[in-house]
Amino acid sequence: MEVLLLLLTLSFSAVVISSNNSIPVHFWLFTINNLEEYEDMVFDGSSVTLSPDTLYDVTKPTKVVVHGWGGETHIDEIFALAYAEAGLDYNIIGVDWRNMEGPAQEQVVEVGVYTAHFLKALIEDYNLLLEDVHPIGWSYGAHVVGRLDLI
């Protein structure tokens, strides 16, 4: 049973990795300067588009925060407020995958790989340094974070 599950996971991952299609996952940017309203970081599956007046600052540490199953708790906002209250000026990127459909086991793989492609695009297009990225997952979001290495 464990081998079968591993094979199913690997085969599903391979399908996602080869796809550059957009899926219903959104990336929200919070900084110390926009705690009330996030900035949308648009990702089409291969490239990231930032607003011309973006608050994203590649020179600051980046926290990638992934909510749990269903996304009822806005954990990204909670982290953004906590870091701001501590006087820490970070890029907080919330990964919103609440609109995904299907079994959670498949979703965490797909969202993890998609998020990895998003980060790869930030690295290639905006010179993000991987060592400045700290992924944080809450509940099922931890499983998403665990899939960031699949590309």
Segment roles from a protein language model:
Residues 1-94, 98-108, 116-130:
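Flexible, membrane-associating and regulatory peripheral segments of lipid-active enzymes
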Residues 9, 133-138:
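Extended hydrophobic secondary-structure segments that form protein cores and membrane-embedded regions
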Residues 67, 136-147:
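Glycine-rich nucleophile elbow surrounding the catalytic serine of serine-hydrolase chemistry
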Residues 112-115, 137-139:
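Hydrophobic alpha-helical cores of multi-pass transmembrane domains in eukaryotic membrane proteins
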Residues 151:
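Conserved hydrolase catalytic core segment
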